């Protein structure tokens, strides 16, 4: 009841402020202190801090924003048990105007600043509200270590609560958006709360439906890049798998042990080897860059060992570990094409069914048995076809995650395929997104947001 009363108060308070704001895309800097005042008046936000993203302070005029803040919002650990355990969730706000559109950036990981979806928000001259995912960054809850409530349903309820708290303040239209797992989070939010947003957008977001999703292997080995770069990629993998557990793997274990790190199982080594090449395509926009990197790995043993040691997953890295937990519970995991190298894996201890367990701590190995694909299967087979909330799904051809794009969409969802670029939501860089693709994205978004 307290939250409802405060929200009504804020609605009345903001009404007067918004009446003085502009109808065009320009920012009226006379309102510079108003947002903090309104946020403090709600009593819903804690530890409000100015200018959390120092990287954009000098670009304030260029980015055309008034203020930026970080703060914390009190959430229920279990939204089905209101009044039980609570945790503080970090929220970032880039403010451009009370009557401007608002982009709710549905962070799938920890919040590092106003980075994801910044081009889209800038082009819209929209506010950005970034919500850090539960059990990432500074938003850990009492469920940590039990993981019972680390689900897409609970994360969607987090977003719904933040939206309800801020909607009386930001009066323009709202959309949610994110890249990669953050985009998955947007679609899941629209799935659970289809009436909240005018549009949900996902950039480069995969929708895996098993712990061994085999759609990825053929796409990575046969579709991305050029034949030359794919041949180099396969040669690098073959070299790293030569002699099985007595080859590069043995050297990697020796080096990691000498550095005081835990030696990986052979299964974990194989997963990370494939993931290394996966990332080469994911983040390098040009085939020339990929060829240079893979040639270096192939020709320089020391460089190869360094690459391999650097990418072995550390189970003690908190934020990444939360991701593996979510994969084990609902998100699923890619199979990057182990069958293409069966001749080198035969007779080794590699077991594709042990990939997820190798990424989890021993005390959490039970999570694999809890895997449930119900939500994502329903999203792909039903929600994408019948969604009442308009959707936009943006993919890049050479991004391996595109392998897990939705197989079909209904009339209220739009697919945009970028033939160039990388695993990113960049719209304003011509090297990553052509003017035609950029315009297609903006035309579709503006149809719902203006």
Language model segments and positions:
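C-terminal motif of bacterial Sec signal peptides marking the signal peptidase cleavage site
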Residues: 16-19
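C-terminal subdomain of alpha/beta-hydrolase-fold enzymes, centered on the catalytic histidine
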Residues: 278, 282-450
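Alpha/beta-hydrolase
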Residues: 179, 188-329
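Alpha/beta-hydrolase fold nucleophile elbow
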Residues: 170-180
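Bacterial N-terminal signal peptides that target proteins for export
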Residues: 1-9
């Amino acid at each position: 009841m307290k939250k409802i009363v405060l929200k009504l108060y804020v609605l009345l308070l903001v009404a007067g402020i918004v009446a003085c704001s502009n109808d065009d895309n320009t920012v009226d800097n006379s309102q510079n202190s108003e947002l903090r005042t309104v946020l403090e008046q709600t009593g819903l936000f804690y530890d409000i801090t100015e200018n959390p993203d120092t990287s954009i302070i000098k670009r304030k005029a260029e980015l055309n924003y008034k203020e930026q803040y970080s703060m914390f919002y009190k959430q229920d650990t279990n939204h089905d048990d209101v009044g039980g355990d609570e945790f503080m969730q970090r929220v970032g706000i880039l403010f451009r105007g009370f009557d401007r559109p608002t982009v709710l950036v549905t962070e799938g990981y920890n919040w590092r600043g106003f980075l994801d979806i910044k081009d889209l928000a800038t082009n819209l001259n929209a506010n950005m509200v970034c919500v850090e995912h539960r059990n990432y960054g500074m938003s850990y809850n009492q469920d940590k270590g039990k993981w019972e409530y680390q689900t897409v349903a609970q994360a969607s309820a987090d977003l719904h609560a933040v939206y309800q708290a801020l909607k009386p303040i930001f009066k323009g239209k709202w959309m949610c958006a994110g890249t990669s797992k953050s985009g998955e989070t947007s679609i899941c939010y629209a799935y659970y709360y289809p009436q909240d947003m005018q549009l949900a957008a996902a950039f480069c977001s995969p929708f895996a439906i098993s712990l061994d999703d085999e759609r990825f292997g053929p796409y990575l080995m046969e579709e991305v890049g050029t034949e030359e770069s794919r041949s180099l990629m396969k040669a690098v993998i073959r070299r790293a798998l030569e002699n099985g557990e007595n080859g590069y793997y043995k050297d990697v274990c020796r080096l990691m042990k000498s550095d005081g790190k835990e030696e990986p199982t052979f299964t974990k080594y194989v997963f990370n080897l494939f993931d290394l090449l996966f990332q080469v395509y994911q983040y390098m926009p040009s085939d020339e860059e990929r060829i240079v990197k893979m040639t270096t790995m192939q020709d320089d043993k020391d460089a190869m060992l360094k690459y391999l040691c650097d990418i072995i997953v550390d189970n003690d890295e908190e934020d990444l570990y939360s991701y593996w937990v979510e994969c084990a519970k609902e998100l699923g995991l890619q199979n990057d094409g182990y069958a293409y190298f069966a001749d080198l894996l035969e007779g080794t201890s590699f077991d594709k069914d042990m990939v997820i367990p190798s990424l989890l701590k021993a005390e959490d190995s039970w999570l694999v048995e809890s895997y449930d694909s119900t939500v994502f299967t329903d999203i792909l087979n039903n929600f994408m076809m019948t969604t009442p909330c308009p959707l936009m799904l943006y993919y890049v051809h050479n991004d391996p995650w595109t392998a897990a794009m939705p197989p079909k969409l209904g009339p209220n969802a739009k697919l945009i395929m970028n033939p160039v670029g990388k695993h990113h939501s960049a719209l304003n860089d011509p090297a990553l997104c052509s003017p035609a693709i950029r315009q297609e994205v903006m035309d579709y978004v503006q149809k719902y947001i203006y």
